[in-house]
Amino acid sequence: MQVSVRDNNVEQALRALKKKLQREGVFREMKLKQHFEKPSVKRAREQAEAVRRARKLARKKAQREGAL
């Protein structure tokens, strides 16, 4: 990952880097990899996340259809 520093503004470059890392999911992955996660726990977590995503998508779709 690469961020250019313009006009010696390191703070702005750090913010841009943090935003890129956040978008890529690096922080979330690091948090998950801090400790070993049993395969059964991982599978359950991923299924719960999928259900959450599906509900969110359905909610957005219903809201969009209600607005039309």
Swiss-Prot record:
Source superkingdom: Bacteria
One GO cellular component, as annotated: ribonucleoprotein complex
Key words, A-Z: Ribonucleoprotein, Ribosomal protein
Coiled coil: none
Keyword tRNA-binding among record annotations: no
NCBIfam families in UniProt: S21p
Name recorded for this polypeptide: Small ribosomal subunit protein bS21
Taxonomic lineage: Bacteria, Pseudomonadati, Pseudomonadota, Alphaproteobacteria, Rhodobacterales
